[in-house]
Structure formats: structure tokens, C-alpha cells
A protein has these predicted regions:
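Phosphate/pyrophosphate-binding catalytic cores of soluble transferases and nucleic-acid-acting enzymes
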Residues: 1-296
Length: 296
């Protein structure tokens, strides 16, 4: 079975940077597993690794569709499989890197996904509920679901998948033999890094990025449904928040809550090898990967 390396962790943990270093050292290529990085023009808000920091490591599944277009987990899985198989065919190592738990699991666990038409009657019932009501409904079924409470589209899709069974998605035999490395920080350090990253991205033009998307015709509805940075900034630009400072403070709190939920989601998987970034884990991770690749 072909082998794949997954690097996961919460927002601001440093997983993308260590993944670039590892891929660079091992001749690998990175497949982004982030539900917002697939959109063109959504760079700062989604946290794409700048080209200048990619060390010439090829990155896949960035800028796949225009902002505003529909993109499903099934779309992601299909493209991720294609990218991984292409990387392997060229004798390279695929690194699946990201914090969107369902996207990661769809590849590493081999979810059975299809483009079957949704149950429109059930969808109509869901549409009648507010976003908080939908989120509470999901939490009753899957308390550790790593999803932004304001991302209405994703919450609804997860509820639809739960409608006909007990699991979010059925699992087939995985396509790849996978080593998953989890990257984490101590809680207070992660919170500090989230604050610093948000301040840096705001200074780099994150608000202007969202303004530009709106000027290009990307709907407020779409931006609001994406949650976190895009939701809060869109709310600020439409007068929901009284000041930029208030908005950024509330956004920072929301990102911290989401990072906690990401950790809860990933910690369900007992196969993940966790490494603390404070321990400078590059050499440890490199050894783990080399041993995994060399094993029969």
C-alpha cells in the first residue's frame, strides 16, 4: 500500500511550517487540507503559507475554485486523491497538512463519499432553523465535531450526513498507509500565538482582503457562512460591530474556541503521534517518517 504522511493540529500551532521543513528535507509535496484555502483570493484570512515561506515545496489544493463557488468534502477528497496519486507516481512523498478534521479524515480513513442528491425535504426542515439551533442540534449528536459554530453550510452538511445513520460518513478501506503526526502547543502559548498571528494578518491587510472580495461580487452570505475571520470582518464591514478593535477581540476569542475544538477532534484518533513544538520536534518527526517509510 502506498504511504502518506499527515501533519495535523490546531490553528497557529506551527504545523504548516514544520510540514514545509519536513517535505523539503524528504523530497515531499504538500496537499492542503483546509476548507477555506481552496478558494482563490482568500489568502490572509485562511492562513495560506506565503510563497516566500514554502521553500520551493510544491503545494496542492490551494486556489482551486473562485470564492463564492460551492466546494464539498467529496470535491476535496477527489482532488486530494488525485494529487496524492500524482505525487506518488513521480516517486515523491505526499504530505497531507491541515486543521480541517473532516477533510483530513476523508483521505486518511477513506470515507465513502458520493454526489448523491441531498434529501431536499430534510434540508428544507433544516433551513427553517437558525444557525445556533443547527449547531446545538449537531452538538447533541457529535459533541466533539470540529466545526465553526457560525459555518452554517458545514453544520448543515454534517447534519445531512447524520440523517441516515449514526456516523458522519461511512468508512471504507483507506487508500493509503498513513502516519499522522499531530503538532501542538501548550494552551497559553497557543492563545498568545493566535493573538499575535491575528495582529500580524490585520496589519498585512486582512480587512482589505475581505473588502476586495465583496467589491468583486462575493456575497456577504458566502463570507458569513465561512465563519471566523471572514464572518467577523464581514460583520464589521456591514456595521454589526461598533469598532474594529471590538471585532478583532471577539474574533480572537472565537479562534481560540475553535482551536480547542480542533484538538478535541484530533485527540479522538489514538493513532496520531503528538509532538510539542516547544521541544523543537523536527528531528524527531524526521526520524518517525523515515522509519515509517522504510518499514515493510
Amino acid at each position: 500500500m502506498n504511504k502518506l504522511i499527515a501533519i495535523v493540529g490546531p490553528n497557529a500551532s506551527g504545523k504548516s511550517h514544520i510540514a514545509v521543513d519536513l517535505a523539503s528535507a524528504l523530497g515531499g509535496e504538500i496537499i492542503s487540507a483546509d476548507s477555506r484555502q481552496v478558494y482563490r483570493g482568500m489568502d490572509l484570512g485562511s492562513g495560506k503559507t506565503p510563497v516566500s515561506e514554502r521553500k520551493n515545496v510544491p503545494h496542492h489544493l490551494l486556489d482551486v475554485v473562485d470564492a463564492g463557488e460551492f466546494f464539498s468534502m467529496a470535491d476535496f477528497q477527489k482532488l486530494a486523491y488525485e494529487a496524492a496519486d500524482d505525487i506518488l507516481s513521480r516517486g515523491k512523498i505526499p504530505f497531507l497538512v491541515g486543521g480541517t478534521g473532516l477533510y483530513v479524515d476523508s483521505v486518511t480513513k477513506g470515507y465513502l463519499l458520493s454526489d448523491v442528491e441531498p434529501d431536499l425535504k430534510y434540508r428544507d426542515e433544516l433551513e427553517k432553523l437558525t444557525t445556533p439551533e443547527l449547531y446545538d442540534m449537531l452538538m447533541e449528536k457529535v459533541p466533539d465535531a470540529a466545526v465553526d459554530r457560525f459555518n452554517r453550510n458545514r453544520v448543515m452538511r454534517m447534519l445531512e450526513k447524520l440523517h441516515d445513520g449514526d456516523d458522519i460518513v461511512p468508512t471504507a478501506s483507506p487508500r493509503y498507509d498513513v502516519l499522522t503526526i499531530g503538532i501542538y502547543r501548550e494552551r497559553e502559548e497557543l492563545k498568545r500565538r493566535i493573538d499575535e498571528r491575528l495582529t500580524r494578518r490585520e496589519a498585512e491587510g486582512m480587512l482589505e482582503e475581505v473588502r476586495g472580495l465583496r467589491e468583486q461580487g462575493v456575497s456577504d452570505e458566502f463570507l458569513l457562512k465561512l465563519g471566523l475571520e471572514y464572518r467577523y470582518i464581514t460583520e464589521y464591514l456591514t456595521g454589526v460591530w461598533s469598532s474594529e478593535e471590538e471585532m478583532l477581540n471577539e474574533l480572537a476569542l472565537a479562534i481560540k474556541r475553535f482551536a480547542k475544538r480542533q484538538m478535541t477532534w484530533f485527540k479522538r484518533d489514538q493513532s496520531i503521534v503528538w509532538l510539542n513544538m516547544n521541544d523543537k520536534p523536527f528531528e524527531t518527526a524526521l526520524t518517525l517518517i523515515k522509519n515509517f517509510l522504510e518499514a515493510e
